[in-house]
Curated annotation (Swiss-Prot):
This is Probable multidrug resistance protein NorM. Pfam families: MatE (PF01554). Belongs to the multi antimicrobial extrusion (MATE) (TC 2.A.66.1) family. InterPro entries: MATE_fam (IPR002528), MATE_MdtK (IPR050222), MdtK-like (IPR048279). GO terms for biological process: monoatomic ion transport. NCBIfam families: matE.
Length: 464
């Protein structure tokens, strides 16, 4: 069966209620992403004013961290989708089993990531063209961040559990508290304020892991108090069928993120051909572009949660209604942000650097990315929709194809042979965005996602 984003599958009187549900879930998730963005901006701004080379090194180490945390992404996405479907199906026993097994997976992934700490130098050495301070900053930051992985793991999975239960407000509040703590500690530890020693890059990393452990403690208290998860009824032993379902749904998303993050690392190597200044401009451009991620992330989370819930109920009309209304909201928000980015690139870039050369090379690419928010709105909507129904494999395959046939080859040719520097690399990135979003949309419109949606619903029902 073929579908359309322009067709309303719901009775007109139900559309306002669906839109209200989406906004209710999306706004706190947007708020959480705003706070995450502010944390990223603060980190980048503090380090940018401390040393732009230190800022670039930290940017590289963060990309490596995103690559190595694939199991964490699997556990997080799997928890959100399976818990949402189980709640929609009204299966309390399945919800409890999935909740406990999500806790076990959070601890397991934290241990695995922490065990990678001794390999931090090896992981950074994949970049062959690094300069001295950039290389040393990247290695120092990654070593500290990996040592504190348990806090990241618990925060990510427990927040995902709450989103699956339809609570996006609590993760926002906890993220806000931890990020404001992080910003304070960043300033104090990077520059040596309020009695702290000046620690530079190490200070930024220590501030991050301390704040994440505080957040992990708060979220642990919250999920054990929540009635939906029934965790206080007693320990449920690890159950392979529940863990397998969480990972079956979440693992393709983890591989998708691994493929994307690996592509981003390759992309960074292409940028380093153009010079360290081009890479610094890229990091700043990504932070400016993150303004559009706020609405995209929030609405995508809301779509995943509601689609999962209605899929668990077996209500296809509401699944389609959520997807259509989510796309309309995403389009409205992201195009608005895109216009702002296009019209005012320089003031946004100056938040992160005062270096005239970096500002100049960043302006045009940032303006261009503002024009392509329409495609990013499609991409984020389709991600939320397909994941909510358990269709996590097709986005993974599409991302792999798009990264390796559009982003990387186009960027390499533009940078290496046309000498276009940062602009050339971002032409490759835009080609990837257009190709990826179009393929995901075509898959949704074809109706081929329905079989997996039914399978996800039936498997969750069996977990009780």
């Amino acid at each position: 069966m073929r579908y359309s984003l322009f067709k309303n599958y719901l009775p007109k009187e139900e559309v306002p209620e669906i839109r209200k549900e989406l906004i209710k879930l999306a706004l706190p998730a947007m708020g959480e992403n705003v706070l995450q963005m502010l944390f990223g901006m603060a980190d980048t701004a503090f380090l940018g004013h401390y040393s732009w080379k230190a800022m670039s090194g930290v940017g590289l180490s963060n990309q490596v961290f995103w690559v190595v945390q694939v199991v964490l992404i699997a556990a997080s996405m799997g928890a959100t989708v399976t818990i949402a479907n189980a709640i929609g199906a009204g299966n309390r026993k399945a919800v409890r089993s999935l909740a406990w097994n999500s806790v076990f997976l959070a601890i397991f992934t934290g241990v695995i990531l922490t065990a990678l700490t001794p390999l931090s130098d090896v992981l950074i050495n994949i970049f062959p063209n690094l300069e001295g301070e950039i290389e040393s900053s990247a290695k120092e930051y990654l070593k500290v961040i990996l040592s504190g992985s348990m806090g990241f793991s618990i925060m990510a999975v427990f927040s995902a559990m709450l989103r699956g239960a339809g609570d996006t407000r609590t993760p926002m509040i906890v993220t806000g508290l931890t990020n404001f703590l992080n910003i304070f500690l960043d300033y104090a530890m990077i520059f040596g304020k309020f009695g702290f020693p000046e620690m530079g890059v190490r200070g930024a990393a220590v501030a991050t892991i301390l704040s994440r452990f505080v957040g992990a403690g708060i979220l642990t208290y919250v999920i054990f108090k929540r009635e939906e998860f029934q965790l206080r009824k007693g320990l449920v032993p690890p159950k392979w069928s529940s863990q397998k379902e969480i990972l079956r749904v979440g693992f393709p998303t983890a591989i998708e993120n691994f493929v994307f993050s690996t592509g981003v690392l390759m992309f960074a190597n292409i940028l380093l051909i153009a010079g360290a200044e081009a890479y610094a401009g890229h990091r700043i451009g990504i932070n400016v572009e993150s303004l559009s991620f706020m609405p995209a992330f929030g609405i995508s989370v809301a779509i995943t949660t509601l689609v999962g819930r209605y899929n668990g109920m077996g209500n296809k009309e509401h699944v389609l209604g959520v997807i259509r209304q989510g796309w309309i909201l995403s389009l409205l928000f992201q195009v608005t942000v895109g216009i702002i980015i296009f019209l005012f690139p320089e003031p946004l870039i100056r938040i992160f650097t005062s270096d005239p050369q970096i500002i100049e090379i960043s302006k045009l690419p940032v303006k261009i990315i503002g024009l392509f928010q329409f495609f990013l709105a499609i991409d984020s909507t389709m991600n939320g929709a397909l994941r909510g129904t358990g269709n996590t494999l097709p986005p993974m395959i599409i991302t792999f194809i798009s990264i390796w046939t559009a982003r990387l080859p186009v960027a390499f040719v533009m940078v290496k042979y046309f000498q276009l520097g940062l602009l050339g690399a971002w032409i490759g990135m835009i080609a990837d965005i257009i190709f990826r979003s179009t393929l995901k949309l075509l898959f949704f419109l074809s109706g081929k996602w329905e079989k997996r949606a039914v399978l996800t619903r039936e498997r969750v029902k069996e977990l009780g």
